[in-house]
Amino acid sequence: MKDELEIEGYKIEGISIGGQETCIIFPNLSLAFDIGKCPPRAVYQQFLFISHGHLDHIGGLPMYVATRGLLSMKPPTIFVPNAIKDDVQRLFEVHRAMGQSELKHNLVGLDVGEEFYIRKDIKVKAFKTYHVIPSQGYVVYSLKQKLKKEYVGLPGNEIKQLKFSGVEITDTLLSPEIAFTGDTTAAFIVDSTNADVLRAKILVMECTFVDDKATVEHARLYGHTHLAEIVKYAEMFQNRAILLIHFSARYEAHEIREAVSRLPEAFAGRVFTLTEGF
């Protein structure tokens, strides 16, 4: 895995080739989205978020857990769509029987709209996506405390007394930092419940097809997004940065870059591509 990007203050590593493997790593947060074939760097992430059950996104899951155990690392916490949680549990039971190993991990099923705190100042929420099997994306939020307006300017000792007396002196500021779509049609863009996805600081989204080698209708039929639809909805993206992933293996890196270079002015300077492996 050679590609390492730094976007909006976050280091991003990974590989994503449509139909082969997808794993996107944010080492600053010790988390990965999808596990693909379990690239080595993924093993060192404590939290793993799975978008859906296709093998190019979940195939490396047993290896991820087994390798962490081999390295005497803390059992990871793995998040999956609640619809496939039982199947994932059975998957681990089979591998435990075959390999006679413990495969220690914490498995959490999340439904769309449910959230989980991975740190007291970081939470992750599942959002609705539109693939051909049960799927969901994830939004990572940062939480910060800000002194309420009515207490701004008060002496420090008065603020301290208010706090000790049980008065709530701060407001919680919730900011969407990162959104990851997994596999989905462009329908997620116009879903009004996904407003935070389109205003996250960084949006990592699939873009399986980038030119007329495949039609928009073909992309929709197989649960994917075409670059033409991203262009269609250009004004809806409020993100500071958009990282396009999951390009079809039919493309070469230069074809991807050329297609993206033709994006309208609305995307200028904020669209990146992950072309590791192309």
Pin down the residues of each PLM region.
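Conserved beta-strand hairpin/beta-sheet module of binuclear metal-dependent hydrolase folds
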Residues: M1-Q46, Y138-V140, K146, T170-T181, ...
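Active-site-proximal loop/helix segment associated with metal-binding centers of metalloenzymes
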Residues: I17, I122-L198, I202-C207, D212
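Metal-dependent catalytic neighborhoods of phosphoester/phosphodiester hydrolases
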Residues: G60-T67, E93, E252-S261
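Active-site neighborhood of divalent metal-dependent phosphoester bond hydrolases
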Residues: K74-P76, A83-G109, R250-E252
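Binuclear metal-ion centers of metallo-dependent hydrolases, dominated by the metallo-beta-lactamase
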Residues: N106-E114, F188-F278
